[in-house]
A protein has these predicted regions:
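N-terminal periplasmic "start-of-domain" segments of outer-membrane beta-barrel proteins
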Residues: 3-33, 59-60, 75
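Extracytoplasmic beta-strand/coil segments of soluble accessory domains associated
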Residues: 22, 39-82, 98
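Non-catalytic regulatory/gating segments with a bias toward low-complexity or hydrophobic composition
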Residues: 22, 30, 41-42, 100-105, ...
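Transmembrane beta-barrel domains of outer membrane proteins
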Residues: 41, 103, 123, 136, ...
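Outer-membrane beta-barrel translocator/receptor signature
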Residues: 59, 73, 86, 95-98, ...
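Short acidic/polar hinge/loop motifs at secondary-structure boundaries
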Residues: 80-106
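Outer-membrane beta-barrel transmembrane strands
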Residues: 87, 188-191, 197-199, 209, ...
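Periplasmic-side early beta-strands and strand-to-turn transitions of outer-membrane beta-barrels
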Residues: 129-130, 138, 153-240, 247-249, ...
Length: 289
C-alpha cells in the first residue's frame, strides 16, 4: 500500500488521516495527463473546474461551485509554502513540479485568506532528491512547441541546488481578417527558476526559491455575431452582414505579464516541535491592451 505523507509547516500527517477531501497528483500522474499549468487540473480532480478564458490575466478556480471570476480568489494557491495572492499569477509553467495537493473545502483555519473553497499546494522538485539534468521538448499542430531544461546538483550533504529555464510558443488558431489573416491569439512565454537548500545542522534547513516568467499573449478573438433578437423586435435591420463571423481588428491586442516570485523558508526541528518561518515576495507587472 502506497502511503503519501503531507509535510508542511501547517501539518505533518498521513493523507488518509486528514479530516478533509484531498487529491494528490504525483509527477507520474502529471506527465501522463500533460499537466503543464494549473488549468489542466480541470477534469482530473473531482469537484474542480478552471475555465479557459484565453489569457493568463484571469485564472478563476472553482471547487464545489465556490470560486470568484474577478477580484479576490476563493481558492488559495501555495507554491513551496509561499502563497500566491493574485489570480493573475496562478497560471505559470509547471516544468519543475514534483507534486500537487488539492484540499477541497474551507481551509481558512490553517491557511487564512482566499481559501474559503479549498486550497491547491504545488511542490517543486528538491535538488536533494533529484539528481541530473531534465530536458523536455514538445510540439503540436498550429505551430505550438515548448522546451525546458533543469539541472539538479547535490554538492555535499549540506547543500544542493537546482536551476533551469523554459520557453514555449503558441502559434494561435483564430485569424484576424483585418491584418492579412494574422493569428490573433498567438503567444510566447519564457522564464527560469532557481532553488537552493542549505542544511547547516541536522535540525536546521534553509530553503530559497526564486522564479521569473515573462508572457506575451495575443487576445480578444471576438467576432461579430449580427444583430440581436432584441434589435430585430424593435424593427432594426442588419447593416454589417459581411462582417458576421469574422474577427476584424485594425490593431493587435496583447497581454504582457512579468512575474517574479521569491520565497525563503527557515525550518528548525526541536525535540518536541518544529519551528518554521516562511517569507515570500511577489512582483507582478502586467498590461492588457
Amino acid at each position: 500500500e502506497e502511503v503519501v505523507v503531507i509535510a508542511t509547516p501547517k501539518e505533518n500527517r498521513k493523507l488518509r488521516e486528514l479530516p478533509a477531501a484531498t487529491t494528490v497528483l504525483s509527477q507520474k500522474d502529471m506527465q501522463a495527463n500533460q499537466v503543464n499549468s494549473v488549468k489542466r487540473l480541470s477534469g482530473l480532480i473531482p469537484n474542480i473546474f478552471i475555465p479557459e478564458y484565453g489569457s493568463k490575466l484571469t485564472t478563476s478556480i472553482y471547487i464545489r461551485g465556490i470560486g470568484s471570476r474577478i477580484n479576490t480568489p476563493a481558492i488559495g494557491l501555495y507554491v513551496d509554502n509561499i502563497p500566491y495572492i493574485d489570480k493573475s499569477a496562478f497560471d505559470f509553467n509547471y516544468s519543475d513540479i514534483e507534486r500537487i495537493d488539492v484540499l477541497r473545502g474551507p481551509q481558512g483555519t490553517l491557511y487564512g485568506r482566499n481559501t474559503m473553497g479549498g486550497l491547491i499546494k504545488v511542490h517543486t522538485k528538491s535538488p536533494f532528491t533529484y539528481q541530473g539534468t531534465d530536458i523536455r521538448m514538445g510540439a503540436a499542430t498550429y505551430n505550438d512547441y515548448n522546451v525546458s531544461l533543469t539541472h539538479y546538483h547535490r554538492i555535499s550533504d549540506q547543500f544542493a541546488f537546482s536551476t533551469g529555464g523554459f520557453y514555449e510558443h503558441t502559434g494561435g488558431f483564430y485569424q484576424n481578417s483585418a491584418r492579412n489573416n494574422e493569428r490573433v491569439d498567438k503567444g510566447n512565454a519564457g522564464g527560469g527558476r532557481f532553488r537552493g537548500i542549505y542544511l547547516p545542522k541536522d535540525n536546521l534547513k534553509l530553503d530559497l526559491n526564486v522564479s521569473y516568467e515573462y508572457s506575451d499573449q495575443g487576445g480578444y478573438p471576438y467576432f461579430y455575431t449580427g444583430i440581436t433578437q432584441e434589435g430585430i423586435n424593435k424593427g432594426k435591420t442588419e447593416e454589417r452582414e459581411e462582417m458576421i463571423g469574422k474577427i476584424a481588428y485594425n490593431d493587435r491586442s496583447n497581454y504582457y505579464r512579468n512575474l517574479l516570485n521569491a520565497g525563503f523558508n527557515v525550518e528548525y526541528q526541536a525535540k518536541n516541535f518544529i519551528l518554521s518561518a516562511v517569507t515570500g515576495y511577489q512582483h507582478l507587472k502586467d498590461r492588457m491592451f
